């Protein structure tokens, strides 16, 4: 089957979001342009890494290329709305790529479908016919800053960590290794 690359050159929206309750959330990245919406499933850690690397890339393009990169998210780009429904997974993300397109002055994010084998780096940010399906999104530096800020909020919106061991607290409590397995009540979850 031929490779499918979903390209969003001027997305109306590109966001990280979740479906489900903290502790049982599924993470998605969703791109929308006109009437077309694509959602891909992604691991929480991948969202965190993408936000971190994107912030680093924005700093680098500001210093190396003199691009106009806002330090804070412009008010008109703050997006707190839920994911567009229905949320239908196109694929699960395996490899991710980031780049800077100097011609269009856009950050490029590419999300490749997970595969059983290793992904050749040559297919990342390339239009070769062989390789995993992909979503490629072009963002202005301001939109990239907004995406990274929302992604951080989404990642950190889960269960609160135990103040002793750092493991996530469940509403029913949690068995804390720092307390020799003593079950901490959910009151600890309500503190802090």
Segments from the language model and where they lie:
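Positively charged, low-complexity terminal tracts
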Residues: 1-192
